[in-house]
């Protein structure tokens, strides 16, 4: 073997072996238990970042561990390759998105291979290829035929200068990012998929996701947002019109003092015809980009419409106000306002001088609404026939009265809205719908799929090439002239079913059901928690759609989910002559000074600039604190980077990048290499004979098998990879101190090293692969079995007992493992140190904690 550890040399050799032998290519095998391990696939942005490396190292550790458990392991990889960044890069680089994307894929593919990830590259997919999106288009047409797809107008960001739709991230301070024109809201027709048809099932099945983090499940429950309430009908004074309002607090209905409606509500439009102030307010609201998330913090404003609503029970008239905090696309676009018992309504009423009435009070006292609304549930009062009822009784009594009088109905509502999948961008999968000459909209026939996205285009930064090219949209269906849809799919469409396509990526159908049902559901899914309410919800929804289409037979797409934490790094900047911050890479920091707690107090970069240190922040381009994985691999080797990633932090928590920690990981691998090379250089012909072992040799062997047990549990069940590494490091300390004098000494070291190679194989596979063979093991380590704990080795012949006198440790004694209290007490009392501390004292009490502690109380 090589005497010195040379990572670049051994990693190249091992990776060539994996490639030549197609080590990680798998097929279905009914005789083997399968394990499908999947990390969320990357967007091909150009280079891997450390967040990718952490995600994919975790996945690779799990996959390799399961392989050594004897399972048939699938670990695929691909590219989430449609999306807006490619369009922006194409505009900036004066190229088309396709070549930019494919170049990035090749570059990042090589980076993944350098890190030694054990992917089945024969299953590689890129979502921007027709071979992939053809089946997405086909499935969309099937959903349309089932009534799960529809088209309706919805609001978008519109640049009137460029006459184009803008993504939210292209709106900067209310203006177009390109020409600085104020952005307007415009209603245009868009395609939707009825995710709400699955809302109840998506919510209920969260309870079956035992292997998912509670935080993700809670976020999805809240996002789906099931509520039970009453939808009631209000009349409009002086008009024959009515409108509906939904509430989860019908117990407060008797306290309604005004009604708030969205600026886009039909009643607001009617009132605006004779109310210039209201008309101006409506225009202002329409041209603002208020999201649901912004409602909580923005200033609440409104204008009286001059209309009055008729209370459905009392018949009393209350004013109708148009308000900016009511959204037309959420609920009915109208809310009943009870300022006595809702803080937002209270603040609005105070601002505009509207009435505030209390109708709910605490069970054990009076209510004070002079300074703030009373928002708790309680007892109804000032509520006529409903006085004295508690929340539940009041809810039911008022609901029953509304239902009986035909003015309301009980209803379950969801916060979840149907999924708008239309995007007015170019670099996405074309939506496979056409409009015939007579205006009829139909799906593109299956024999005309895929609807190809032209890749040889010029990006002008203003309009999508397929919208600008009027000829592209022209087609024929069944001999009739037709126009293609020029919108493309939301890129969440591609990432909602890619996991299933990996099961049969070359199939001339969306999925091969036999293969899909062999591999699915995914056994372990790995990705960031930021995807909890978008990707992970669409992922679950799509799986149910695939199930109902007869393509898969499971209810959920993934059994277990691990959400890894972010990678942080030091961030530094200086102020340049223009007064602007210039962020400096940690790699360009020349010197630092630290206080006695290790905190950076001063830093200077390579150009002599004194820097401001802002602490550990998420690695990002904006703060220039990203560390290029490739630089680290070239400097230390892939195994070192992988080992640091697994050792530095539990997987769900943030990881602080410290090059000193990387250096420590590198030193550990070199120690392992040195120990193995020293062992290999000796005569190791004597086989292990447990019957010949001394007590010291048995103790060392016990450490080996305790480590096997701990690492197996840490990786397999707990997924605490950092403590698994720590356990092996501790074992290494024992092995380095152990003598290699006798044949049995060396036999134990040999057994230990053989185990260590397999324990570390998931984390540092190149080193483990190489040393496994150098140690004389037959066959490749990939085909070996995970080490098994020898339970007999864990049995201790003796125990080390701590002896305390009056609470202070005075001695440590070795006793037989099965020694009883009397014999332990006798040995302890006769220890020379104990005798010394008991001199002149009378023993009052002796407490024995079996196998651990002998405590003597004396005075």
UniProtKB/Swiss-Prot annotation:
Subcellular location: Cytoplasm
Catalyzed chemical reaction(s): tRNA(Leu) + L-leucine + ATP = L-leucyl-tRNA(Leu) + AMP + diphosphate
Residues binding ATP, per UniProt: 621
EC number: 6.1.1.4
Record keywords, A-Z: Aminoacyl-tRNA synthetase, ATP-binding, Cytoplasm, Ligase, Nucleotide-binding, Protein biosynthesis
Keyword Cell division: no
Motif 'KMSKS' region, residue range(s) on this chain: 618-622
A single GO cellular-component term on record: cytosol
Pfam families: Anticodon_1, tRNA-synt_1, tRNA-synt_1_2, tRNA-synt_1g
GO terms, biological process: leucyl-tRNA aminoacylation
GO MF entries: aminoacyl-tRNA deacylase activity; ATP binding; leucine-tRNA ligase activity
Domain of life: Bacteria
InterPro entries: aa-tRNA-synth_I_CS, aa-tRNA-synth_Ia, Leu-tRNA-ligase, Leu_tRNA-synth_edit, M/V/L/I-tRNA-synth_anticd-bd, Methionyl/Leucyl_tRNA_Synth, Rossmann-like_a/b/a_fold, tRNAsynth_Ia_anticodon-bd
PANTHER family: LEUCINE--TRNA LIGASE, MITOCHONDRIAL, LEUCYL-TRNA SYNTHETASE
Name assigned to this protein: Leucine--tRNA ligase
Protein species of origin: Shewanella putrefaciens (strain CN-32 / ATCC BAA-453)
Record lineage: Bacteria, Pseudomonadati, Pseudomonadota, Gammaproteobacteria, Alteromonadales
Encoding gene (name): leuS
